[in-house]
């Protein structure tokens, strides 16, 4: 609920927080104690005990001695209706509670004065309700029993029975000291208060020095376990919650985290958070590896509340509150995508939308490079001062027009959009290089995607947030030097680095290198075995000439080898032919000898006849062989 000018009354210490005239809460009978969690200062909403009927404000300083008369019921409004609550952090937390809590948990502290005031008014164990967590719904039942004029309290602390503001109304910005109070984004302490209530009971029984109903602070050895519990609780309550991995880099000689992206899509939340992380405006716990989208939103909201101006005029304050209210309404879109409508006349010219207020409040520049070259007159005339949405509508209307000039303009505008589908032109790249300041951290919009960008020594670099490079320590930035998107990877100091180390070269490339090396070795050994005289090769010969000579030598040896194979085949064929011929001549002569035995004279004649064809066959074979060799 926005606070009007007539209700802007400062709340001084020692004065009871009563309702301003005309600013009563519509649900005063069901209000409950609200505790601000997170890194910012905590604020307790002032409430009255249902048993005593007296108002007590719990904060860094006790307001029990207020100006309200004893015994008179006083209706106190929640934090959302307080017009201005300027409390310092030193007044809100006791010295014992200065220790920074582990992210994902929210510290709940109370000063000794507050504890004494709570005991006097029935807020402690001696009171009617005690300071223990109530199950969901008990706050409303006690409130109904006590009456609508006296808001009841089941204890001094409660986070499970929150009563959010009515839809359409945003809480006052001065009363929000932590982003966890926003009903749109429940904090991690609410998860623990509902789902981890049973886990806190044994710790209280063991004598842990923790307030009842509070989230206990864990030691360094329990950080990982508690983060896992918070992550599991967030997944249970928000099944569609996104989880992001954290990559730690050495940025300007300091260990700095960046949030990686698991899916490619429009996620301005990561681009904004990475700008704040690289600027050291937002810090994460050391060695944190996983973070949820809800935690990122909480970090961002706390930073927005911490950076609100303190000393400004009334008009500026009202304007800032209106902008903050509009920004809170669109914060949930940061996880999916913002409605950004570029104009083609400047790198920082966008059509005004509520989404752009987020960048203005965070003081983060937003750039794009989709510009029209002013030297091309027909495109300048066709596009004009239109935004992207207006240009699309103009193209549709021009196509349906009967005027040939309008049809031509629509065609030129359509060609411009088709030719610059990457949403980056060379003219826009030149304008970006000249506009972005040296060392500036900003957000770059291109292809419906938001990236973290910086400028180093006159060159633009985009932060590599792809989860695939999570373990690549030397791949941090990617150069933006052309419109094709084929930049070079660099490390955190903007030195060119390959995507992988030499030890982790792609296995297929390594196998190919090994095969080529083995082939070269085999050729070298073969050449050495054939006694190639390398001394005859001149020293100044080029690689091409050497390759030609080696190829000629190889061709000569191959032809010689083929000739030898042909000669061997011809010799084998002639030998088989002679064997078959001799077998055919021996067959008819052997039959008479076996049929009738002859005398010694006949046998001598037969032996002569056998020797003659043999000699003739040998002569024929010699002639054939000599012909083949020639």
Swiss-Prot record:
InterPro entries xrefs: MINDY (IPR007518), MINDY_domain (IPR033979)
GO molecular function terms noted in the UniProt entry: cysteine-type carboxypeptidase activity; cysteine-type deubiquitinase activity; K11-linked polyubiquitin modification-dependent protein binding; K48-linked deubiquitinase activity; K48-linked polyubiquitin modification-dependent protein binding; K6-linked polyubiquitin modification-dependent protein binding; K63-linked polyubiquitin modification-dependent protein binding
Keywords: Hydrolase, Phosphoprotein, Protease, Thiol protease, Ubl conjugation pathway
Reactions mediated catalytically: Thiol-dependent hydrolysis of ester, thioester, amide, peptide and isopeptide bonds formed by the C-terminal Gly of ubiquitin (a 76-residue protein attached to proteins as an intracellular targeting signal)
GO biological process: proteolysis
Residue stretches of biased makeup (Polar residues): 24-33
Signal peptide positions (record): none
Biased composition regions of type Basic and acidic residues, renumbered to the chain: 606-630
EC number from the UniProt entry: 3.4.19.12
Sites marked Ubiquitin-binding: 543, 546-547, 550
UniProt entry tagged with the keyword Protease: yes
Key word Translocase present: no
Protein family according to the UniProt entry: Belongs to the MINDY deubiquitinase family. FAM63 subfamily.
Protein name (record): Ubiquitin carboxyl-terminal hydrolase MINDY-2
Gene from which the chain derives: MINDY2
